[in-house]
Amino acid sequence: EQDINQMGGVWKKLPYTWVLMIIGTLALTGFPLLSGFYSKDAIIEYAYLRGNTAGYYAVVVGIFTALLTSIYSWRLIFKTFHGDYNNNKLKIDTMHESPLVMLIPLIVLAIGAVFAGYFFKELFIGHSSSNNFWIDSIKFLSPLSLDHPPLWIIYFTPVIVVLSIPFSHYL
């Protein structure tokens, strides 16, 4: 079935897929300490540190898109895995977990989502790192400030993402 409105309550039949989807959703929405947190927040923080109109515009757009991403991702989890099963064509009893050939790639991706952000953050962000492998891939018109962004910039997006979870449940 491709209509998520006809799904629901399948987490008991697909427990591994459910856990892997939760991990992927947490990473995609930028949950702290997962891979999406480091990349998304680094972009927003660096945009703020530009200190100009384009940078502030990028911050607003980045935070807004993080909010939308969180809402649609958690809506997918709630509609697909929780709630009532509404499909009259396919009986829930016939549903089963995916074979290992499909689960193994998902497990590898979930491991990367959990650990890659932490282990490779210095490579991508460059804090106290002498390895500037990615430095030429990011072009700036002028050097960034060495200041740190204010705390509200650091904490605002994760707070918005967490607050969007109950909101997306009711969509």
What are the residue ranges of the model-derived segments?
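Alpha-helical multi-pass transmembrane bundles of energy-transducing inner-membrane proteins
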Residues: E1-I4
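Membrane-interface segments at transmembrane helix junctions and kinks
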Residues: Q6-V19, Y38-T65, N87-L171
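Transmembrane alpha-helix interface/packing and boundary motifs in multi-pass membrane proteins
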Residues: G24-L33
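Acidic glycine-/aspartate-rich tracts in secreted/extracellular proteins
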Residues: L26, D84-N87
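Residue-level hotspots within pore-lining transmembrane alpha-helices
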Residues: A27, T65-L68
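Extracellular glycan-interaction patches encoded by glycine-rich segments
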Residues: L33-L34, A66
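Alpha-helical transmembrane segments of polytopic integral membrane proteins
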Residues: K40-D41, S70-W74, F78
